[in-house]
């Protein structure tokens, strides 16, 4: 008796099933790695790290003051530029995440206090009297 040929969707379902089972087996190990890396990388600097940070900052200042950047190769300068841009871009992404809005801070229409509104109205009234 001949076996029936699997359709495209049956093959797809079999493939996704195998991939899912593999990923489900790997998940606990990957989660443990993610937690360990996150705990290490996202931790604030310890007091023991401060001297190394100061030394690196001093080296960077000396590098800029003595204009050693003119001696960099094209590849090195592109790598350093890419790293600097990445830091700047992630800063802006963090700002967007922090304010929970992409284009700026959401300011309610009644943000201006009553006191400020009263002062503006008084200035307008005085300006109208003078005119």
UniProtKB/Swiss-Prot annotation:
Q: Where would you say this protein principally sits, based on its record?
A: mitochondrion
Print the keywords alphabetically. Answer: ATP synthesis, CF(0), Hydrogen ion transport, Ion transport, Membrane, Mitochondrion, Transport
Q: What InterPro entries does the database record attribute to this sequence?
A: ATP_synth_F0_gsu_mt, ATP_synth_su_G_mt_met
The entry's cellular-component GO terms read: mitochondrial membrane; proton-transporting ATP synthase complex
By sequence similarity, the record places it as follows: Belongs to the ATPase g subunit family.
Q: What is this protein called?
A: Probable ATP synthase subunit g 1, mitochondrial
Question: Is the keyword Ribosomal protein in the record?
Answer: no
Q: How does it assemble?
A: Subunit of the F-type ATPase which has 2 components, CF(1) - the catalytic core - and CF(0) - the membrane proton channel.
| Gene Ontology molecular function, alphabetical | proton transmembrane transporter activity
């Amino acid at each position: 008796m001949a076996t029936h040929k699997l359709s495209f969707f049956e093959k797809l379902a079999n493939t996704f099933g195998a991939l899912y089972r593999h990923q489900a087996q790997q998940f606990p190990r990957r989660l443990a790695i993610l937690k360990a890396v996150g705990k290490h990388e996202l931790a604030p600097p310890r007091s023991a790290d401060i001297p190394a940070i100061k030394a690196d900052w001093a080296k960077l200042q000396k590098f800029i003051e003595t204009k050693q950047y003119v001696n960099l190769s094209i590849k090195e300068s592109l790598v350093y530029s890419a790293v600097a841009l990445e830091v700047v871009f992630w800063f802006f992404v963090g700002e967007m995440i922090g304010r929970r809005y992409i284009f700026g801070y959401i300011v309610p229409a009644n943000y201006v206090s009553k006191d400020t509104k009263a002062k503006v109205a008084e200035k307008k009234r005085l300006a109208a009297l003078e005119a």
